[in-house]
């Protein structure tokens, strides 16, 4: 008799995706982040669902409803901090996942890579709208500043901003629609994840060497499931440590003050995971130029497969490319730091230099390093 997991119409899809999936035997722990991201998404949807049961998306009650969740709802504080810090874990895993793709040349699977970039945009949009919901000072002013950037679009900009706001300023209509979209988008993200996996399973996984591994495959279960569970435990340990010991470590103290349109905080900044893009935005004096640089800082990932010049796929045997990769990593950390600093003398110039370097590394230095390594191979 045929095993039910291989014959049942539904179970066989799960079987071919997560159990009998042929996987390269050499993939390292850097390949764990896909499964961790799936778990992060599930955690965010679950905690978000329970939070939505108690939250009210009205400007007069939103802030108090969040306080009510923390004080009066059973384990409401834990739900709230799991959701807020779960978003941070989500972005840590996302950035490591993208970094792994860059380092090992996984971007050569163009459909999977492009789907991943779309997913990154969707997650960023969801996180931004979620940050507005507690209706604290930073929520309100963050929403005002970021949505206002669209007014830089020629001709239709102002109308577009007022259309998004649902009025002449960030108000009740804005909060209600942001809550609606924040609730809806994770389910769209879950559907996009299915497409991402569909494209991935068309080609099979890449591996650290970057060479085809068709002759050396092992089943996903039990080998990689065990490895993924280790990563899961480590992530849960980190998340629970954050939630139970320092839940506000990554938040902004200003968000504990109710939103006040008449009082601007001294330094408006987004959550830490957007600071690198925010620093790039601020480093350009022109509004439209800043908005374009902000969008391009993420959209540039789309053209990375076109900028691949090396004969080798992975960076594992390419020292020059490795140097440029770690320079990019350091540059992103510098941008993240700058994004959190006030706009004054040393920080402005550091931010501008780091922004130029960011685009320079991706567009010029990395392709040149690949070409140089090709020549070195001939020696």
Swiss-Prot record:
GO cellular component annotations of the record: mitochondrial inner membrane; respiratory chain complex III
Broad class of the protein's primary localization: mitochondrion
In terms of domain of life, where is this protein from? Eukaryota
One biological process term from GO is:
mitochondrial electron transport, ubiquinol to cytochrome c
The residues that cross the membrane are 33-53, 77-98, 113-133, 178-198, 226-246, 288-308, 320-340, 347-367
Mutagenesis / variant outcome for changing residue 16 to N: In strain: Isolate MR-M981
Q: Does the keyword Iron-sulfur apply?
A: no
Taking the record's annotation, the residue ranges forming a coiled coil are none
* CC cofactor note: Binds 2 heme b groups non-covalently.
The entry's heme b b562-binding residues are: 83, 182
**Compartment(s) where it occurs, according to its Swiss-Prot or TrEMBL record:** Mitochondrion inner membrane
Necessary cofactors: heme b
Residues bound to heme b b566: 97, 196
List, in alphabetical order, the Gene Ontology terms for molecular function in this entry.
Answer: metal ion binding; ubiquinol-cytochrome-c reductase activity
Q: Where does a ubiquinone bind?
A: 201
UniProt keyword annotations, A-Z: Electron transport, Heme, Iron, Membrane, Metal-binding, Mitochondrion, Mitochondrion inner membrane, Respiratory chain, Transmembrane, Transmembrane helix, Transport, Ubiquinone
Q: How does it sit in the membrane?
A: Multi-pass membrane protein
Q: Which InterPro entries match?
A: Cyt_b/b6_C, Cyt_b/b6_C_sf, Cyt_b/b6_N, Cytb/b6-like_sf, Cytochrome_b, Cytochrome_b_C_euk/bac, Cytochrome_b_N_euk/bac, Di-haem_cyt_TM
Annotated Pfam families: Cytochrom_B_C (PF00032), Cytochrome_B (PF00033)
Impact reported for residue 295 to V: In strain: Isolate MR-M981
Assembly behavior: The cytochrome bc1 complex contains 11 subunits: 3 respiratory subunits (MT-CYB, CYC1 and UQCRFS1), 2 core proteins (UQCRC1 and UQCRC2) and 6 low-molecular weight proteins (UQCRH/QCR6, UQCRB/QCR7, UQCRQ/QCR8, UQCR10/QCR9, UQCR11/QCR10 and a cleavage product of UQCRFS1). This cytochrome bc1 complex then forms a dimer.
| Annotated function | Component of the ubiquinol-cytochrome c reductase complex (complex III or cytochrome b-c1 complex) that is part of the mitochondrial respiratory chain. The b-c1 complex mediates electron transfer from ubiquinol to cytochrome c. Contributes to the generation of a proton gradient across the mitochondrial membrane that is then used for ATP synthesis.
Extra remark: Heme 1 (or BL or b562) is low-potential and absorbs at about 562 nm, and heme 2 (or BH or b566) is high-potential and absorbs at about 566 nm.
Q: What is this protein called?
A: Cytochrome b
Source species of the chain: Laephotis capensis
